[in-house]
Design a protein with these regions (language model features):
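Tryptophan-anchored aromatic micro-motifs
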Residues: 125-133, 434-436, 494-496
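N-terminal type II signal-anchor transmembrane helix
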Residues: 1-24, 87
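Transmembrane beta-strand segments that form the barrel wall of outer-membrane beta-barrel proteins
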Residues: 176-180, 203-210, 283-291, 359-368, ...
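Flexible beta-edge/linker motif
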Residues: 5, 32-101, 106-141, 157-178, ...
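Sequence/structural signature of outer-membrane beta-barrel proteins
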Residues: 400-404, 441-443, 499-503
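Outer-membrane beta-barrel translocator/channel fold
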Residues: 248-252, 323-331, 404-406
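Outer-envelope beta-barrel architecture signal
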Residues: 55, 77-79, 126, 171-173, ...
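Amphipathic hydrophobic-ligand
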Residues: 23, 52-66, 142-161, 187-196, ...
Length: 521
C-alpha cells in the first residue's frame, strides 16, 4: 500500500534523481516512478544530461522488474526491461570532449588507489527490448556531408531491439542480440542484426553474426577495434575491422550510401562472398576470398584494397588464384556494352596479379579463353567513360583462334608474343602499335611459321613491315592494308624470295615462284 501511494512514489522519484545527479555530476530527471506489485517499476520521461547540459539519454517510458542484488558479486539484476521512445546521442564537442565520458568516468573512474578486493559492479538484464528508439553519433569538430552515409553525423531512427542475457560491467556491454532493425539518415536500412555482441570503449565484437539489409546478408563474424568512442566518428580511417564471412551476400547498392559515385555509375551487382578481411575501410587486407557474381563469374584469391570509400581513389593489389568471367557478366557489372569480339572469347579465366585503380591497372598472369590461352603483362587504362580502353605491355597467345575472334573464316589459329601500345578492341576503334614474333598463323588452310611484324593498326588500316621465313614462303613486306572496304585495299612493296603456291593452297599445280612487287590496288 505504501509503495502504491502517490506520496511515496513522488518521494522516491525525487530521491532517485537527486542521488543520480549527485553521483554523475550532471542533470538527471525522472518525471514519475510507479511501482506495480508483481510486475515491477515504470519510469516516465527519464532525462540524462551530459557535461554540456545537452541530452545524452532520454526515454519516454522505461519498465523493468527488480530481480535482486547480490552483494558478494556486486550484481544487480533487472528483468524484462522495456524502453519506449528512447533517444541516445553521443557527441564529440568542438573542444574535443566526449559526452559519454560523463558516464564512463563514474563507472570506471581509474581511481589512484583501486580497490582490487572488491568485484566490479555488474548490472544484468535477462531481457531488454527497445521500441521506436533513435540513436545519434556526432563529431562536431568535422564538416558534415549533405548526402550519403557520414561517419561524423550518424543518425539511426525507428530502432527496434530485442536482446537477452544483457550484462553491463564497468564500461562494457555483453549481450545476445536477437533482433535489431533501424533506418540510418542516409537511407541505409538495417532489416535484421543478430549475434552475440560485446561493446566497450575499445571494441565492438559480433560473433554468430547474421546481418541483413535490403541488398546484403552478412554472416559469421565481424569485429571493430578502436581507441575510444571518438574514433567511431572517423570510422573509415580509424576503426580496425576484422571479418570472417561465410556464404554472405553483398549488394553494391549498399555501397551507394558510402560512395554516391557508385549510384551515378549505376553499379548494382550483388556478390556472394566467403573469406577473411582485416584493416580499416581505407586500408583492407583480404585472404582466402571466394567471390561469385553474375551467371558464371568467380574469384578466388587474396590481396588488399586501399582508398575506400572513394571509388576513384580505390587501389587494388590482388593475387588471383582462380578468376573466371564472361562478357555478359562484365557488361551487367560495369553497365557498358562490350564489342562483339569480347563475347566470342566465351568464359575467360585469369590466374596472376592485378594491381592498380579500377580504371588504370596492370594485369600480370595467365589467360584462359574459349578461343585459346595466353600470358599477359598489360597496363589497362579504361578512362572515365569506360568506352574505349587504352593498353600497353606484353601479350603472348598460344593456339589462339584469331580468325573466330575477328570473324574472318580464311584465318585460323595463331601463337605469338607481342609488345603492344594502343587503345580500343573493336575493329573500327582500334589504334595500336605492335611488335610481334609469330610462331605460326593459319591462313587459307596453311600454317605460316616464323613471322615478325612491326607496325601500326589505326582506322581499320595496317601500316608496317612483315618478315616471314617459312619453309614454303620467304616474304618481306612493307606497306599498308586498308580494311575499310568490303574488298581490302593494298599498297605495299613486297619481296617474295620464295613461295610454293601449292603448299600454300593458292594453286593445285607444282608452282614455285619468286618476285618483287610494288602493289597499289
Amino acid at each position: 500500500v505504501v509503495f502504491n501511494s502517490n506520496t511515496f512514489q513522488n518521494y522516491l522519484t525525487s530521491k532517485v534523481t537527486e542521488v543520480l545527479s549527485e553521483q554523475f555530476k550532471t542533470k538527471i530527471t525522472i518525471n514519475h516512478i510507479r511501482y506495480y506489485p508483481f510486475t515491477g517499476f515504470a519510469l516516465e520521461q527519464v532525462y540524462w544530461g551530459d557535461q554540456k547540459n545537452d541530452t545524452l539519454f532520454y526515454v519516454e517510458d522505461l519498465k523493468f522488474n527488480f530481480g535482486g542484488f547480490n552483494s558478494l558479486e556486486s550484481k544487480l539484476t533487472l528483468n524484462d526491461v522495456v524502453l519506449e521512445g528512447a533517444y541516445c546521442k553521443m557527441v564529440t564537442y568542438p573542444d574535443h570532449t566526449f559526452n559519454l565520458d560523463v558516464l564512463f568516468n563514474i563507472l570506471d573512474p581509474n581511481d589512484t588507489i583501486p580497490d582490487t578486493l572488491s568485484p566490479p559492479f555488474k548490472l544484468y538484464f535477462n531481457r531488454v527490448a527497445c521500441h521506436n528508439t533513435r540513436f545519434r553519433l556526432i563529431d562536431s569538430t568535422r564538416v558534415f556531408e549533405p548526402e550519403g552515409f557520414d561517419g561524423f553525423n550518424q543518425d539511426y531512427n525507428n530502432i527496434e531491439l530485442l536482446a537477452r542475457d544483457f550484462w553491463i560491467i564497468k564500461d562494457s556491454l555483453h549481450f545476445d542480440l536477437k533482433k535489431l532493425s533501424c533506418l540510418e539518415r542516409s537511407g541505409l536500412e538495417l532489416k535484421q542484426l543478430a549475434g552475440v555482441a560485446t561493446i566497450c570503449p575499445q571494441a565492438m565484437l559480433f560473433d554468430e553474426l547474421n546481418m541483413q539489409t535490403a541488398n546484403s546478408n552478412i554472416r559469421n563474424q565481424f569485429h571493430m577495434i578502436y581507441n575510444g568512442w571518438g574514433e567511431m566518428a572517423n570510422f573509415n580511417y580509424k576503426v580496425q575491422l576484422k571479418g570472417n564471412l561465410h556464404n554472405s551476400t553483398f549488394g553494391m547498392k549498399d555501397l551507394h550510401y558510402f560512395a554516391p559515385l557508385l549510384r551515378e555509375m549505376k553499379l548494382d551487382e550483388s556478390f556472394t562472398i566467403s573469406g577473411e578481411g582485416k584493416g580499416t575501410v581505407n586500408n583492407l587486407r583480404l585472404k582466402n576470398m571466394n567471390i561469385k557474381f553474375g551467371s558464371k563469374s568467380v574469384f578466388k584469391g587474396s590481396g588488399s584494397v586501399k582508398g575506400l570509400p572513394s571509388v576513384n581513389d580505390m587501389f587494388l593489389d590482388i593475387q588471383s588464384d582462380d578468376a573466371e568471367t564472361n562478357a555478359n557478366d562484365i557488361e551487367h557489372l560495369v553497365k557498358m556494352e562490350l564489342p562483339n569480339e569480347m563475347d566470342r572469347l566465351g568464359q575467360m579465366g585469369f590466374k596472376g596479379r592485378f594491381t592498380g585503380f579500377y580504371t588504370d591497372f596492370v594485369a600480370y598472369g595467365n589467360l584462359k579463353t574459349a578461343l585459346g590461352n595466353g600470358q599477359s603483362d598489360l597496363n589497362m587504362k579504361l578512362g572515365d567513360s569506360l568506352t574505349i580502353p587504352s593498353y600497353s605491355g606484353n601479350l603472348t597467345l598460344n593456339d589462339f583462334d584469331i580468325g573466330q575472334l575477328i570473324n574472318q573464316p580464311l584465318v585460323g589459329k595463331t601463337s605469338f608474343s607481342a609488345s603492344v601500345k594502343g587503345k580500343g578492341f573493336n575493329l573500327k576503334d582500334i589504334e595500336t602499335s605492335l611488335e610481334s614474333n609469330i610462331a605460326y598463323v593459319e591462313a587459307n588452310g596453311y600454317r605460316y611459321k616464323n613471322t615478325r611484324i612491326l607496325g601500326d593498326f589505326k582506322h581499320k588500316m595496317f601500316a608496317g613491315k612483315l618478315d616471314m621465313n617459312d619453309e614454303n614462303a620467304e616474304v618481306h613486306f612493307d606497306g599498308t592494308i586498308d580494311l575499310n572496304k568490303d574488298i581490302p585495299l593494298y599498297k605495299f612493296k613486297a619481296n617474295i624470295a620464295y613461295a610454293d603456291l601449292k603448299a600454300l593452297h593458292f594453286d593445285t599445280s607444282n608452282l614455285v615462284f619468286s618476285t618483287k612487287m610494288d602493289i597499289n590496288f
